[in-house]
Amino acid sequence: MERVAALGLDIGKKRVGVAGCDGTGLIATGLTTIIRSSFVADIPQFEAIVKERNIKILVAGLPYTMAGELGFQAQQVQKYAQKLAIALDLPLEYIDERCTSLEAEEFLKAKKQFSSWDKGAIDREAAAIILQQWLDRRRRVNTVV
């Protein structure tokens, strides 16, 4: 079985939630939240994670509108994700992330780990949900012969 080295990203205006997965590609886990300042200042933080985890692909959540269209926010996410993929020299895939932040918040509340002050926890959990969806889809595609 090939090793999976993917990084899940929940890209927002102020923060980027980051998630990684185990080498088997079964379980995604929130890793950290990067506070965005400038793109140039953000890059070294991503480079360190990519190097440490030997990342081979980026998976970014794309916030489609409820009508399934690419709105302004989705276009901004695409712009940032594409620049990031180029800067890190990694391939990039997208996952529909409608409602992942809400799902992440509900999950953290259920675990009694929710704090309205810790927005970074929601971003990390949303990134884990995004990456888990990608891992699950990848597994389904690879098992269908």
Swiss-Prot record:
InterPro entries: RNaseH-like_sf, YqgF, YqgF/RNaseH-like_dom, YqgF/RNaseH-like_dom_sf. Its EC number is 3.1.-.-. It is found in: Cytoplasm. It comes from the Bacteria. GO terms for biological process: rRNA 5'-end processing. Transmembrane segments: none annotated. GO terms for molecular function: nuclease activity. It holds the Pfam family RuvX. GO terms for cellular component: cytosol. Keywords: Cytoplasm, Hydrolase, Nuclease, Ribosome biogenesis. SUPFAM superfamilies: Ribonuclease H-like. The keyword Cytoplasm applies. Gene3D superfamilies: YqgF/RNase H-like domain. The keyword Nuclease applies. It is an enzyme of class 3 (hydrolase). Belongs to the YqgF nuclease family. Could be a nuclease involved in processing of the 5'-end of pre-16S rRNA. This is Putative pre-16S rRNA nuclease. It comes from Microcystis aeruginosa (strain NIES-843 / IAM M-2473).
